[in-house]
Amino acid sequence: MALPTPSDSTLPAEARGRGRRRRLVWTPSQSEALRACFERNPYPGIATRERLAQAIGIPEPRVQIWFQNERSRQLRQHRRESRPWPGRRGPPEGRRKRTAVTGSQTALLLRAFEKDRFPGIAAREELARETGLPESRIQIWFQNRRARHPGQGGRAPAQAGGLCSAAPGGGHPAPSWVAFAHTGAWGTGLPAPHVPCAPGALPQGAFVSQAARAAPALQPSQAAPAEGISQPAPARGDFAYAAPAPPDGALSHPQAPRWPPHPGKSREDRDPQRDGLPGPCAVAQPGPAQAGPQGQGVLAPPTSQGSPWWGWGRGPQVAGAAWEPQAGAAPPPQPAPPDASAASTDASHPGASQPLQEPGRSSTVTSSLLYELL
């Protein structure tokens, strides 16, 4: 027996073509007939619903929805009043026969499901005309299909990609960072909050070494823009500047790190040649630092275990601050070898003291810098 659909006589012509079905307004006589049937049996069978639908002039699927909504309202009211729900009364009535869907009908429904998992009333009515099935059964078919296959069909949510899922060179470009690394003692750096999964996905300003597969990169709240590398360093605190990453193809050649410029000078008065001092540095990692000409990283001068680094201009330093020429003053002598504290570090951290054993290279570059300044 073919069931009437809402498109036969109940819905006006202007309601068809919209995304959702138009709300059905019940007349007082229809509401009384429905409530009287509900008092007799809250769970009417298919035969009772069809007779009631024919009597009040409403399609049977709308009558079924009304009974479902009324049962939900009554159940909520009984729960608020702490009364037990009576449930079914009387003998159970027959249920609707299972709708048989042929292979061709299933193929049409599957193609429509692949295009749109949530078809509107107009699309469902069009499918009802093509398949010969009632629109209400098509709606139930789509509901069941969405429940069984939540990830299939159209309008699927896009997968959110992250830094680790993005291929090198793809996605949004990462901002250029100049990272700071917190050091408790010279040569010891704290681990970064997060580490990119691939060296190709590292943002500019992170530090790549030949010995390290992934280098730590700080969060944006702890980083400064690349243009701000010549900004003054903090007056106090145990922070070390980190040199920017070299361009592609130049990772195998170590470059000289930059000490922070003088705090009292402006950006225009600073000489970029005076700010940079020679000497390789290592990537800051937990534990003893491994210095060597392997790449750029956080500048972490070595010291003994008992003498921490208190900041710029205080305590022992590796290369010292940049020389500032004065009127009538002769250039200072060549830097002296490290003191006893650095010698004690050689025994505990042999890797960190290796960059200091290059007097020829250091004196040559320092002499050239002093000659240019004079």
Curated annotation (Swiss-Prot):
Domain of life: Eukaryota
Keywords on record: Cytoplasm, DNA-binding, Homeobox, Nucleus, Repeat, Transcription, Transcription regulation
Claim: Magnesium is one of the keywords in the record: no
PROSITE patterns associated with the record: HOMEOBOX_2
Entry GO MF terms: DNA-binding transcription factor activity, RNA polymerase II-specific; RNA polymerase II transcription regulatory region sequence-specific DNA binding; transcription cis-regulatory region binding
DNA-binding region(s) from the entry: 19-78, 94-153
GO cellular component labels: cytoplasm; nucleus
Bias (Basic and acidic residues): 265-274
Signal peptide (UniProt feature, chain positions): none
Record carries keyword Transferase: no
Major location (coarse): nucleus
Biased composition (Polar residues): 1-10, 354-374
Stored Pfam families: Homeodomain
Distribution of this protein across tissues and organs: Expressed in muscles, as well as in primary myoblasts and myotubes (at protein level).
Region: Disordered, residue numbers: 1-24, 72-102, 218-374
Subunit structure, interactors included: May interact with MYF5; regulates MYF5 expression.
Disease named in the record: Up-regulated in myoblasts of facioscapulohumeral muscular dystrophy (FSHD) patients (at protein level). Overexpression in primary myoblasts results in disorganized myotubes, troponin T delocalization, and abnormal beta-catenin accumulation following differentiation, suggesting that DUX4L9 up-regulation may contribute to DUX4 toxicity in FSHD.
Its job: Down-regulates MYOD1 expression and may up-regulate MYF5 expression. May regulate microRNA (miRNA) transcription, up-regulating the expression of some myogenic miRNAs, including MIR1-1, MIR133A2, MIR133B and MIR206. Impairs the differentiation of myoblasts and may be involved in muscle regeneration. Reduces DUX4-induced nuclear localization of CTNNB1/beta-catenin and its subsequent activation of target genes.
Name of protein: Double homeobox protein 4C
UniProt organism field: Homo sapiens (Human)
Gene: DUX4L9
